From Swiss-Prot:
Localization per Swiss-Prot or TrEMBL: Cell membrane
Top-rank EC class of the record's enzyme: isomerase
Protein name: DNA topoisomerase 4 subunit A
Topology class, membrane: Peripheral membrane protein
Active-site residues (renumbered): Y118
Originating species: Streptococcus pneumoniae serotype 4 (strain ATCC BAA-334 / TIGR4)
PROSITE patterns according to UniProt: TOPO_IIA
CDD domains associated with the record: TOP4c
UniProt site (Transition state stabilizer): R117
Ranges where the Topo IIA-type catalytic domain occurs: 30-496
UniProt record, GO biological process: chromosome segregation; DNA topological change
Main localization of the protein described in the UniProt heading: membrane
Interaction with DNA, annotated site positions: K38, H74, H76, R87, K93
């Protein structure tokens, strides 16, 4: 008979993963609400206690303990056991360590612990209180993985360990982050709740005001603590504790003496030093980790004129000197993961301790009653000692003697066993007195235990007494200080930036960089690092305190503070915008670039699209947005994928000239174009024919303009030939239509003259040497000096720039800008 079953993979996967999820939720990653331990932690403590590896004995090799735990209770690999053991020994992770370890058990710098064959471990004294009375049937036991031995499913827990040491873990669909607390405060809250089971959060917080991290630091936000204590979820600010020390020469240094919980100190020091190296905030001279056996100490030495408060606020905001700690208090309660506040945690703990105390009392009472029964028999024996001795001597053996005692004197089986095994020296008069005293003590003990079992008040008084004993023995002062509200960090961004001279360059394809004046001066303009198929469209001297706007052919604008640009040598290629701007397209190009000081002036830009739209938009629309480092924003809306921007530039109240591909030119005043929002569409710029598109647009602030056709014909036309009309008209023809090989506009623009302001590029132009570079389809480069061109009639087709260009046709054309500054 075949055992093969046909089942749905979907059903199998769902059922199996469901089982697996249930296992890791209940038996791996989440703590029990009663003892605050995960299964691996519980097994470590129980196994070490079972092997008498306790605080009052000598240390034992960690490897031996790990082997016993793995072999008997936790068959999941030695590394997971050892890692859990090490964490329980780290006093910067636990408020009260449960394992004491000799040797390297890691560090706050994230150093790994020594291998378990080198370290030694034993239970701490306070861990013994978690296991106290476990031998008295106080907690349920279950079979281990191979049914050879039983292990506890929860520990007796003489103190609320879940709150004292907290917990962190991730399982399937659940995670937990419970912060550690001060032992004395937790016990005070538990004692109060024993007397007041319906206590409110506000009252409990008088005893337990907030977490107490082993690394100290400052916790800010009492309202968030209250919210977390009510719901199990909340967020507080944890800030490092710092001091300001005076140094020689009028300098100061910031000294960090406590850092937030779970922060890697070495990484923190490195991040602070990175701030210094990258000059993110001015004034840091040196960063030193001066921590030693006496405690944590990080020194940040400042320069003489540094703004100490500014530096400290910057480090709080941009490094882990200050973090947000997120409460997510999830624990296993009755086999179910629950998000709990401190009331359910304390209630569950008190209910658990009630069961432990009652079970222990029943165990002790039963044991005392058995002993009392035997003591009563022994006292009775002494009063008839001679008869009993004679009876025993007359018996054949031990069993016969026991039977004779039961028959002749009505002793019970237990009493008869105690009598026949009694040593003769115990029959002295002194021992009789001892037995009588023991009887009285046993009766008193039984009465007390009966009172505990039968009276809730007596039982709870004992619970409070035991908790107070733990507090008295192990209480330590609070390490973390509490503040009512999180202090807002205010940073004047401008004051963070050291003002330096630099040169900014941008290429058409989107490579940007800033270059030091030294590197710039050591090279020629032509030596700029770039791709062979790319070209420089912008280079200008600037200050690191200024801003950079880049307008693209797809209607996007990209913002960069100049100080954030990578400082790269002039001969290196630079950083491509796609490395940081996630929505920068492969076919996107930079059209216009400008350096500016501020965004709140009245500057407006005009933008013209290929499909005939025009708009004006204000500069203030581009005030730096939150995601500027990774995303561009729109400055013009395109109609479809075939549309693109053909012109964008700042403009005042000038006329603008638009030139279409089929040779029409239209001139009108920019006031006809409304100022709209950055995301809004424009208005109709020109009445284009069905097969026509806009090819160029420029500001009418010179006396002439040039026009280049796709066949390589170039001409210069007086601006007066284009009469000003209004927008949305067809315009005037600026080319004569031919039947064969008609000319089509490739590029048009203003010819520079004195007083000219470049409308496409901020690069300064030599008005006496404005050269147009034309590249043919075959790669040949032709140069034409625009100032040398004679004025042509409006309807002429101009002159070819070369005898061969007509057959080759134009592939690319652009003005050669010349930097006049330092070059």
């Amino acid at each position: 008979m075949s055992n093969i079953q046909n089942m749905s993979l979907e059903d199998i996967m769902g059922e199996r993963f469901g089982r697996y999820s249930k296992y890791i939720i209940q038996d791996r990653a989440l703590p029990d609400i009663r003892d605050g331990l995960k299964p691996v932690q519980r097994r470590i403590l129980y196994s070490m206690n079972k092997d008498s590896n306790t605080f009052d004995k000598s240390y034992r090799k960690s490897a031996k303990s790990v082997g016993n735990i793995m072999g008997n209770f936790h068959p999941h690999g030695d590394s997971s056991i050892y890692d859990a053991m090490v964490r329980m020994s780290q006093n910067w992770k636990n408020r009260e360590i449960l394992v004491e370890m000799h040797g390297n058990n890691g560090s706050m710098d994230g150093d790994p612990p020594a291998a378990m064959r080198y370290t030694e471990a034993r239970l701490s004294e306070i861990a013994g209180y978690l296991l106290q009375d476990i031998e008295k049937k106080t907690v349920p036991f279950a079979w281990n993985f191979d049914d050879t031995e039983k292990e506890p499913t929860v520990l007796p827990a003489a103190f609320p360990n879940l709150l004292v040491n907290g917990s962190t873990g991730i399982s399937a669909g659940y995670a937990t982050d419970i912060p550690p607390h001060n032992l004395a405060e937790v016990i005070d809250a538990a004692v109060y709740m024993i007397d007041h089971p319906t206590a409110k959060i506000d009252k409990l917080m008088e005893f337990l005001p907030g977490p107490d991290f082993p690394t100290g630091a400052i916790i800010q936000g009492r309202d968030e603590i209250k919210k977390a204590y009510e719901t199990g979820k909340g967020r507080v600010v944890v800030r490092s504790k710092t001091e300001i020390e005076k140094l020689k020469g009028g300098k100061e240094q910031i000294v960090i003496i406590e850092i937030p919980y779970e922060i890697n100190k070495a990484n923190l020091v490195k991040k602070i030093d990175d701030v210094r190296v990258n000059n993110k905030v001015a004034g840091i001279a040196e960063v030193r980790d001066e921590s030693d056996r006496d405690g944590l100490r990080i020194a940040i030495e400042l320069k003489k004129d540094a703004n100490t408060e500014l530096v400290l606020n910057y480090l709080f905001k941009y490094t882990d000197l200050q973090i947000n700690y997120n409460f997510n208090m999830v624990a296993i309660d009755n086999f179910t993961p629950r998000q709990v506040g401190i009331v359910p945690i304390l209630s569950s703990y008190i209910a658990h301790r009630r069961e432990v105390i009652l079970a222990r009392s029943r165990f002790d009472k039963e044991k005392a009653e058995k002993r009392l029964h035997i003591v009563e028999g022994l006292i009775r024996v002494i009063s008839i000692l001679d008869e009993v001795i004679a009876l025993i001597r007359a018996s054949e053996n031990k069993a016969d003697a026991k039977e004779n005692l039961k028959v002749s004197y009505d002793f019970t089986e237990e009493q008869a066993e105690a009598i026949v095994t009694l040593q003769l020296y115990r029959l002295t008069n002194t021992d009789v007195v001892v037995l009588q005293e023991e009887e009285a003590e046993l009766r008193e003990k039984i009465a007390m235990l009966a009172a505990i079992i039968g009276d809730e008040r007596t039982m709870y008084n004992l619970m409070k007494k035991e908790l107070r004993e733990v507090k008295k023995k192990f209480a330590t002062p609070r390490l973390s200080s509490l503040e009512d509200t999180a202090k807002a960090i205010e940073i004047d961004t401008a004051s963070l930036i050291a003002e330096e001279d630099t040169y900014v360059s941008v290429t058409k394809a989107g490579y940007i960089k800033r270059t030091s004046p030294r590197s710039f001066a050591a090279s020629t303009l032509e030596e700029i690092g770039k791709r062979d198929d790319d070209r420089l469209i912008f280079v200008q001297s600037a200050k690191t305190t200024q801003h950079l706007l880049m307008f693209t052919s797809l209607g996007n604008v990209i913002y960069r503070p100049i100080h954030e640009l990578a400082d790269i040598r002039w001969k290196d290629i630079g950083e491509h915008l796609s490395q940081t701007i996630t929505n920068f397209e492969t076919n996107e190009e930079i059209l216009y670039v400008e350096v500016l000081d501020q965004f709140d002036d009245a500057t407006t830009y005009f933008a013209v699209t290929r499909l005939g739209q025009i708009k004006r938009v204000e500069r203030k629309e581009f005030t730096p947005w939150r995601t500027y480092r990774s995303k561009s924003v729109k400055y013009a809306k395109l109609k479809d994928d075939t549309d693109q921007i053909v012109a964008v530039a700042p403009i005042k109240l000038d006329d603008v000239v638009l030139v279409s591909q089929n040779g029409y030119a239209l001139r009108f005043n920019i006031e006809e174009v409304p100022v709209v929002g950055a995301k809004a569409a424009g208005v109709k710029a020109m009445n284009l024919k069905e097969d026509d598109v806009l090819q160029s647009g420029f500001i009418c602030n010179t006396s002439s303009f040039y026009l280049l056709t796709q066949r390589g014909s170039l001409k210069r036309v007086s601006i007066e030939e284009i009469l000003a009309t209004s927008r949305a008209k067809r315009g005037l023809q600026v080319l004569r239509e031919l039947k064969n090989k008609p000319h089509r506009v490739f590029l048009a623009g203003a010819v520079a003259e004195q007083g000219f302001v470049g409308d496409f590029f901020s690069t300064e132009v030599d008005v006496n040497d404005q050269t147009l570079l034309v590249q043919s389809n075959k790669g040949t480069i032709y140069e034409s000096r625009l100032q040398d061109l004679n004025l042509s009639e409006r309807t002429s087709n101009g002159s070819f720039i070369s005898d061969t260009i007509s057959d080759e046709e134009v592939f690319d054309a652009y003005l050669q800008e010349v930097v006049t500054e330092d070059k």
